[in-house]
Curated annotation (Swiss-Prot):
Subcellular location field: Membrane
Species, as recorded: Saccharomyces cerevisiae (strain ATCC 204508 / S288c) (Baker's yeast)
Pfam families: DUP (PF00674)
Topology of this chain in the membrane: Multi-pass membrane protein
GO terms under cellular component: membrane
Listed name of the protein: Putative DUP240 protein DFP1
Source species taxonomy: Eukaryota, Fungi, Dikarya, Ascomycota, Saccharomycotina
Family per similarity comment: Belongs to the DUP/COS family.
Keywords: Membrane, Transmembrane, Transmembrane helix
Coiled coil: none
Positions of transmembrane segments: 4-24, 26-46
Domain of life of the source: Eukaryota
Amino acid sequence: MINFLLFVLTILATLTNIWFSGVLSPAMVIRICLGGSMVVLQIWSFSRPISNETFRTKLLLEVITHRPSIAGKEWKTITYNMNQYLFKAGLWKTPYHFFCEHQCYEFFKDLIKGKYPDVQWDTANTQPFISVPENQAATQNSDVEPTVKWCLFKAAEIQAHAVREYWQSQYPDVGIPAI
């Protein structure tokens, strides 16, 4: 916010110098300053990350419901549903394109990374299991409610499955174990 104020003051000082040279009228200086500050405020408000916990839980549940592949059309459906949710919840001003499917997928990956331990695969029987370092489970997830923990676990499991299937289909001769 301080940077914003310094930015506005710099513009105001520059415009005042131009005004004194007779190029701009006082009304034009005021309009330019107000218009510029409104543009900067709009950009700032749209660049803030969504911090609504319900939004995160809804995204995880969408992933669990649709079970998307890495490059699948399911991400378009999930993205559409999330954009509609953001609009209806008042977190975005229009129902159009807060996320594209690539941004939504990246947001999802960032959401599950570090919040819950990675799902790993037992190469003997190719069944997913969770490897939780002793101190990680107690420290990172202690403030997350059980439903969200379950959603994080299940979504991470689905993501690991999708990644495995993707690479298996890309390189079938390598011998990646079937899931």
